[in-house]
Amino acid sequence: MDETLLDDIIRRLLATNNGRTVKQAQITETEIRQLCLASKEVFLSQPNLLELEAPIKICGDVHGQFPDLLRLFEYGGYPPAANYLFLGDYVDRGKQSIETICLLLAYKVKYKFNFFLLRGNHECASINRVYGFYDECKRRYNVRLWKTFTECFNCLPVSALIDDKILCMHGGLSPDIKSLDDIRRIPRPIDVPDQGILCDLLWADPDREIQGWGENDRGVSYTFGADKVAEFLQTHDLDLICRAHQVVEDGYEFFAKRQLVTIFSAPNYCGEFDNAGALMSVDDSLTCSFQILKASEKKGRFGFNNNVPRPGTPPHKGGKGR
């Protein structure tokens, strides 16, 4: 993709933020198609299980909350000042899924070895057809463009390993993973199936109430207990599981004696929750720290601070689309 055009798309997306309101970006359908095509090539040129190195900043669900994505970059540093890994769920729910996904794809194409995107359960046609992205594409462009995004999403990697010690995914563990090679072997492009390793990586949830594997209230995949986290880490010689997929009150929340962390980066999610959002920084020694996007009653006035861990709040249980 032409470097000058790419830089101009990024400039236009960032220019939507004038300090108080965030306007819609003026990007043509042709430009978005080029962006999808270029990013698809980059995704397929890199493994399905990305092998990354610290230092890196990790973000959870963004869900079309474009002003909050810009705030994440304001506090973490705009690329390439910092390396980033996003854990999926870029679209649906929020008002500006198109700006959100376009900026992330543009950064991916421009900084392919410093900026990484994983697939979330909402990067799937059957889900984002229902929860807002399809309607936004149809209203602002056309259904053809939604299909182009779908083809791009089907090529996203599904997991990342940081310095052989921190395993990241959108959802959670799978009872079918015997070796990390099982993740590497998942073919692409691929739609998200109703069961199996790919489904579980995008849909599974930890559950404090159980041991072993349980039924998931979402109607998809499983829940897993702290014992399964400890067992998985020991088997694969890992230190931490890092995932997203659930709203947590403080933006991040530990599980299983700090062997798993949930990160959620959309504060005041959907305007219905009073949750904070978080950004996790992993330094060279693999020490994790958090920057918090505080919850706020007034949209557009979030504060940030470094937060010490507080007692965890129970994960919200919700329907299939959350």
From Swiss-Prot:
The keyword Nucleus applies. Mn(2+) 2 binds at D89, N121, H170, H245. Pfam families: Metallophos, STPPase_N. SMART domains: PP2Ac. Its main location: nucleus. Strongly up-regulated within developing flowers, especially in the tapetum, the developing and mature pollen and in the ovaries. GO terms for cellular component: cytoplasm; nucleus. Residues 303-322 are annotated as: Disordered. It comes from the Eukaryota. Keywords: Acetylation, Cytoplasm, Hydrolase, Manganese, Metal-binding, Nucleus, Protein phosphatase. The modification N-acetylmethionine is found at M1. PANTHER family: SERINE/THREONINE PROTEIN PHOSPHATASE (PTHR11668), SERINE_THREONINE-PROTEIN PHOSPHATASE PP1 ISOZYME 6 (PTHR11668:SF504). Serine/threonine-protein phosphatase that possesses phosphatase activity toward para-nitrophenyl phosphate (pNPP) in vitro. This is Serine/threonine-protein phosphatase PP1 isozyme 6. The gene is TOPP6.
